[in-house]
Amino acid sequence: MVLMIVSGRSGSGKSVALRALEDMGFYCVDNLPVVLLPELARSLADRNISAAVSIDVRNMPESPEIFEQAMKNLPAEFSPQLLFLDADRNTLIRRYSDTRRLHPLSSKNLSLESAIDEESDLLEPLRSRADLIVDTSEMSVHELAEMLRTRLLGKRERELTMVFESFGFKHGIPIDADYVFDVRFLPNPHWDPKLRPMTGLDKPVAAFLDRHTEVHNFIYQTRSYLELWLPMLETNNRSYLTVAIGCTGGKHRSVYIAEQLADYFRSRGKNVQSRHRTLEKRKS
């Protein structure tokens, strides 16, 4: 397991890096005192979870020896890595001007330029021990996250999770949906007394819907639309794509079609989840 220690000058992108690491599965803690690193690592060792911790000028150890001792006290399962982010002086000044945030050392009545320079001196002991130093001066937020994924996972894109969920319009549209497709115009198994108590997960309902050409056409055209734009969505630094399929009650048509789409993209090697809001409500 890895204990990634993220440090660097304020405004260089530590928060962005920590969010990217969290998306990669790291357990992330912002501004944890160095002396508590071994305790955090021990609490995660049994769970087999890598961790990432940010350290800035506010929680710097008083001496390099304290940092070294904390590294020695880490459980054997953890391999510490120190990532140091930096940017040139003018870039840091511009970023502070854009965000209008206060520098951590501004309480010392220093100008922004002086605070940046003093911070560099205070962080030098960590910078000199860094396993990787990254200059973010010319990087966007997305480029920094992409670089970290490439370095740590060996791939550029974050793995996108596709979520296909069915719902009933009479219960409301899911607020977390990126795309909403209305299938209320398709043939409705509800009007068959034998099928009415069943759901789109049952074979007789699936057989009923499978007999209709318009159902096949809708599934084909919907998956074609998603396939067309999926490459761009995968490179857009997002973790989830939620596709909501709605019918009147959320019991038959939407359930069947959500499952068909989920199975298709799962067979193409995508990371897929499916859920059925109305059916889950009935269980609870």
From Swiss-Prot:
Keyword Transcription regulation: yes or no? no
> Gene3D superfamilies attached here?
P-loop containing nucleotide triphosphate hydrolases
Q: What SUPFAM superfamilies does its record include?
A: P-loop containing nucleoside triphosphate hydrolases
Signal peptide per UniProt: none
Q: Which Pfam families does the record cross-reference, listed alphabetically?
A: PapZ_C (PF22740), RapZ-like_N (PF03668)
Q: Note whether Transferase occurs among the keywords.
A: no
GO terms of molecular function: ATP binding; GTP binding; RNA binding
Sorted UniProt keywords:
ATP-binding, GTP-binding, Nucleotide-binding, RNA-binding
What job does the chain carry out?
Modulates the synthesis of GlmS, by affecting the processing and stability of the regulatory small RNA GlmZ. When glucosamine-6-phosphate (GlcN6P) concentrations are high in the cell, RapZ binds GlmZ and targets it to cleavage by RNase E. Consequently, GlmZ is inactivated and unable to activate GlmS synthesis. Under low GlcN6P concentrations, RapZ is sequestered and inactivated by an other regulatory small RNA, GlmY, preventing GlmZ degradation and leading to synthesis of GlmS.
The family note in this entry says:
Belongs to the RapZ-like family. RapZ subfamily.
What quaternary structure, including any partners, is listed in this protein's UniProt entry?
A: Homotrimer.
Descriptive protein name: RNase adapter protein RapZ
